[in-house]
């Protein structure tokens, strides 16, 4: 018999929002995405997240490996501007439907 969970649930990631692709006035560069991490508002705070892994999790119609959920992994590469936005590169370019959706920014690999 399994006992109920004791205490509060612990989240091992920070939520982020996908803002869009890196772009100039007339071109966009879909191999780099812009992500706003919750609670990060300055360029100095972004430095802790450099190199951290992130995952865009989405639901698909057909099952693969017994699950409808799939994941695109990425990595925080550098800050973008002064307001806490980061640039991230993903293993494959994010689909356009991902704009405005959530991403999980994990606390590893640690660089302490």
Curated annotation (Swiss-Prot):
Sample GO molecular function, one term: structural constituent of ribosome
Keywords from the named record: Ribonucleoprotein, Ribosomal protein
One GO cellular component, as annotated: cytosolic large ribosomal subunit
PROSITE patterns: RIBOSOMAL_L35AE (PS01105)
Domain of life: Eukaryota
Disulfide linkage: none
Keyword Nucleotide-binding recorded: no
Alphabetical list of InterPro entries matching this protein: Ribosomal_eL33, Ribosomal_eL33_CS, Ribosomal_eL33_sf, Transl_B-barrel_sf
Family assignment from sequence similarity: Belongs to the eukaryotic ribosomal protein eL33 family.
HAMAP family with a match to the protein in the record: Ribosomal_eL33 (MF_00573)
Protein name listed in UniProt: Large ribosomal subunit protein eL33y
Classification of source organism: Eukaryota, Viridiplantae, Streptophyta, Embryophyta, Tracheophyta
